[in-house]
């Protein structure tokens, strides 16, 4: 579905400009603060950005633990003394200082945290901690690689991997039967224009196939049943 801005631009730039054509343009997308909700129970309602902000503001916070109670004043003090220090560095230093405190020094803050937790339990009896989901999940580096003939070749090599079967005659002569398209010891050519990472992956895949064949051969050859 085209946006409102692109539809307006197409109408104004056309040679046959007609003001009546503006009436056929849908009103969706006029404001960037309007968000469409996919919830079927909302009956196709429009939700503004202010309402979404309000739902975030109404989120119940977790009760403070002993470390948070202690670090409130310490964080302000350290931020005033070191205005150029980042918040992450302040948190690291506060965590290190908290570990250096004795149990007797930490005990008053544990008591304060227990009181806050009791008050929080009375105010929100049905409260359940729900961690926030990360908006951007880290993706695997392999999925970021662009597809080229070399990567497809690696996939074909893995798909064509087959186990070698051996049949023994009475005179213990071994005959090998392979269903692989490429002969053993010869790997398919790799595209020279591919990236070094993909060439390494193809080489690693070929080595794995050779190791499988060697291991299977050794298992059948050393088996006492066929000796």
From Swiss-Prot:
One of its GO terms (cellular component) is nucleus. This is Sex-determining region Y protein. It comes from Callithrix jacchus. Transcriptional regulator that controls a genetic switch in male development. It is necessary and sufficient for initiating male sex determination by directing the development of supporting cell precursors (pre-Sertoli cells) as Sertoli rather than granulosa cells. Involved in different aspects of gene regulation including promoter activation or repression. Binds to the DNA consensus sequence 5'-[AT]AACAA[AT]-3'. SRY HMG box recognizes DNA by partial intercalation in the minor groove and promotes DNA bending. Also involved in pre-mRNA splicing. Keywords: Activator, Calmodulin-binding, Cytoplasm, Differentiation, DNA-binding, Nucleus, Sexual differentiation, Transcription, Transcription regulation. GO terms for molecular function: calmodulin binding; DNA-binding transcription activator activity, RNA polymerase II-specific; DNA-binding transcription factor binding; RNA polymerase II cis-regulatory region sequence-specific DNA binding. The keyword Transcription regulation applies. Residues 25-56, 170-180 have a biased composition (Polar residues). Residues 23-56, 170-205 are annotated as: Disordered. Belongs to the SRY family. It is found in: Nucleus speckle; Cytoplasm; Nucleus. Residues 60-128 bind DNA. Interacts with CALM, EP300, HDAC3, KPNB1, ZNF208 isoform KRAB-O, PARP1, SLC9A3R2 and WT1. The interaction with EP300 modulates its DNA-binding activity. The interaction with KPNB1 is sensitive to dissociation by Ran in the GTP-bound form. Interaction with PARP1 impaired its DNA-binding activity. One of its GO terms (biological process) is male sex determination. PANTHER family: SEX-DETERMINING REGION Y PROTEIN, SOX TRANSCRIPTION FACTOR.
């Amino acid at each position: 579905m085209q946006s409102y801005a692109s539809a307006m631009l197409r109408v104004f730039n056309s040679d046959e400009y007609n003001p009546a054509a503006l009436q056929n343009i849908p009103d969706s997308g006029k404001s960037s603060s309007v968000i469409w909700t996919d919830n079927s129970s909302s009956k196709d309602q429009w939700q503004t950005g202010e309402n979404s902000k309000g739902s975030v503001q109404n989120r119940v916070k977790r009760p403070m633990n002993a470390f948070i109670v202690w670090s409130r004043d310490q964080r302000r003090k350290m931020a005033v003394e070191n205005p150029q220090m980042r918040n992450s560095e302040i948190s690291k230093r506060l965590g290190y200082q908290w570990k250096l405190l004795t149990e007797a020094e930490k005990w008053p803050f544990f008591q304060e945290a227990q009181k806050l937790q009791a008050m929080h339990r009375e105010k929100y009896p049905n409260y359940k901690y729900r961690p926030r989901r990360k908006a951007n999940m880290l993706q695997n580096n392999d999925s970021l690689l662009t597809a080229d003939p070399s990567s497809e070749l690696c996939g074909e090599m893995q798909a064509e991997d087959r186990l070698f079967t051996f049949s023994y005659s009475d005179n213990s002569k071994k005959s090998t039967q392979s269903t692989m398209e490429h002969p053993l010891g010869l790997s398919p050519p790799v595209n020279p224009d591919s990236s070094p990472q993909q060439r390494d992956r193809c080489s690693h895949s070929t080595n794995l196939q050779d190791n499988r064949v060697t291991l299977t051969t050794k298992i059948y050859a050393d088996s006492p049943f066929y000796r």
